[in-house]
């Protein structure tokens, strides 16, 4: 169909009606609803992940822990990161379009995860008292210890996936800092995360997604896991 002349204002309603008629003829696929009974949650834990400190800058330096950084192409050097929308760092990257990724190595201690994973940058200064940091060429912070390399990213595309945003970025700087192996999620749970006390009676709640322990008899209905950001529905009593 071609419109061969300019559209008059009194013809707009006719065009709307035509557009709606065409839309009605198009087949739309119903959303796929998967049977949750066929999905064993523990199977997802067999996927391998690294652990990273993602840093960005707004009114102040900020960072958070993420576990999803992937190289997409080698030429140009391009990566993707997935960030939970509940994280303050997420909003900073949306606004600025730049970030740094510090790749954590096996020297990273639990205090580092507490600093960047168990508090919000909206209320706390996560870099306060932390000396093992420096600024890259983009002006953002990166770790100089407990990290074997860092990458700087410039966002070229954002993809909305409900609870998370995937940022596609070109790498603008990258540097190797240490030779220690990169930390994986499995290494974190086996060697870094403190083991809960062996008590015979229930004393708290465990996040089924990441294993975080909430100590207390009752879990608030609006509780959000400080590590993986999942809600109370993903906790079970221990």
Range-by-range predicted roles:
Residues 1-32:
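FMN-binding flavodoxin-like domain, especially the glycine-rich phosphate-binding loop
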Residues 28-209, 214-216, 224, 233-234:
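Basic, polyanion-binding surface patches
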Residues 228-238:
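Short Cys/His-rich micro-motifs in 6-15 aa windows
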Residues 1-7, 208-211, 226-229:
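Short, exposed beta-strand "edge-strand" segments with a Pro/Gly-rich flavor and a Y/T-containing core
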